[in-house]
């Protein structure tokens, strides 16, 4: 799908510090917890010309500082990037093997209300690669998230996970629930067995020609074929068939990405991908993620939880409905005309749902203003 004992405080390595700043056009709500001090307004001219209107005072646009660096998680350097102010919202990506990049720029509106902490998981994006792929496990990545929380001294965090990142977020909640204030699970699954059943149904809905083409490639074996540069990954032909024709209808709805390229989607750390997802194709998970069977553990999650899914998501909405039934203090949002990339298809609905969930008092104040 493309897209241990508690450790001590991790050593924070500011190997890279970015001094750039993102600017918003409007200042954050002054009553919100994420509000920062505004720059002083400039004074209007005291004696304007008689034929000119008195200019309105100008307020400097709010600035949202961005910082990036690395946290040493038991010898593995984990990349992070933060933007915004307020209570921390840690965001983990899917793949496995993608990076935080695909969240941008879509999640930036959340920075007006929270300090966003994007993480590249071990082996992914800018984070350190491992010599031994056996170190790519959900359990190790849970410890990496905890290392970032400790290293940045974040205190309690809200945690948002998308796709495989949602699996990681569930696993973090099982072990470190006391460190969570909120949990957000987006387009994800609680059971590999159930997800593999979804893949069977996806294949059944393909045209006979496409299904036969994919089945033949998977039967032959997906690695060691094609041109020399293709031998350690899926061939271009298989990526086009699986990620292009097979997956694309489940990725987007309202706003398909015109730049989506199934071959570019294959730019992943293949040793990680094969270790976790498996080597037998896109429509079966048989790597170490086959151990993900969380359904019976979900009732143990007691933090407020928001579950979001597209109405024709690759991670079928039935999976999110079951998570909602199992987690007592949970809300379920099914985004209309949306596939797996809900925050692309329905950016406004997505970001508004997250903001309302994390800041219910802000929602009440806005409703009061609208009614006054």
Describe each PLM feature range.
Residues 184-228:
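Flexible "cap/lid" loop of the alpha/beta hydrolase fold
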Residues 314-319:
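Conserved alpha/beta-hydrolase "acid-adjacent" motif
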Residues 330-372:
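Catalytic active-site module of serine/aspartate enzymes centered on a nucleophile-bearing elbow/loop
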Residues 121-164, 352:
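Active-site loop/oxyanion-hole signature of alpha/beta-hydrolase fold enzymes
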Residues 301, 307-309:
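Short beta-strand/loop motif that positions the catalytic acidic residue
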Residues 155-198:
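Conserved hydrolase catalytic core segment
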Residues 265-293:
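Hydrophobic, aromatic-rich cap/lid helix
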Residues 76-129:
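Conserved HGGG/HGGXW glycine-rich cap/lid loop of the alpha/beta-hydrolase fold
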């Amino acid at each position: 799908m493309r897209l241990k004992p508690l450790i001590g405080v991790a050593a924070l390595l500011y190997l890279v510090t970015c001094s750039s700043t993102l600017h918003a056009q409007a200042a954050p709500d002054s009553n919100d917890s994420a509000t920062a001090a505004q720059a002083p307004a400039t004074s209007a001219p005291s004696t304007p010309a008689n034929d000119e209107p008195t200019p309105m005072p100008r307020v400097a646009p709010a600035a949202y500082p961005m910082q990036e660096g690395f946290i040493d998680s038991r010898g593995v350097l984990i990349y992070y990037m933060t933007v915004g102010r307020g209570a921390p919202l840690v965001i983990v990506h899917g793949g496995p093997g993608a990076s935080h990049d695909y969240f941008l720029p879509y999640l930036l509106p959340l920075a007006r209300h929270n300090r966003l902490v994007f993480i590249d998981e071990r082996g992914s994006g800018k984070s350190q690669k491992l010599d031994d792929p056996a170190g790519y496990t959900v359990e190790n990545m849970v410890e990496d998230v905890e290392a970032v929380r400790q290293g940045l001294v974040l205190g309690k965090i809200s945690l948002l996970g998308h796709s495989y990142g949602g699996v990681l977020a569930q696993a973090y909640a099982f072990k470190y629930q006391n460190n969570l204030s909120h949990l957000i699970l987006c387009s994800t699954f609680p059971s590999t067995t159930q997800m593999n059943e979804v893949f069977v149904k996806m294949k059944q809905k393909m045209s006979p020609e496409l299904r036969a083409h994919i089945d033949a490639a998977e039967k032959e074996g997906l690695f060691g074929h094609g041109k020399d540069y293709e031998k350690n990954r899926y061939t271009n032909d298989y990526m086009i068939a699986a990620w292009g024709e097979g997956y694309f209808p489940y990725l987007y709805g309202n706003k398909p990405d015109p730049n989506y390229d199934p071959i570019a989607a294959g730019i992943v750390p293949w040793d990680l991908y094969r270790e976790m997802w498996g080597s037998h194709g896109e429509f079966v998970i048989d790597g170490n993620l086959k151990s993900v069977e969380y359904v019976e553990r979900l009732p143990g999650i007691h933090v407020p939880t928001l579950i979001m899914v597209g109405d024709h998501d690759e991670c079928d909405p039935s999976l999110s409905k079951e998570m909602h039934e199992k987690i007592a203090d949970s809300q379920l949002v099914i985004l209309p005309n949306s596939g797996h990339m809900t925050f692309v298809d329905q950016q406004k609905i997505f970001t508004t749902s997250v903001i309302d969930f994390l800041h219910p008092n802000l929602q009440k104040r806005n409703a009061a203003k609208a009614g006054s």
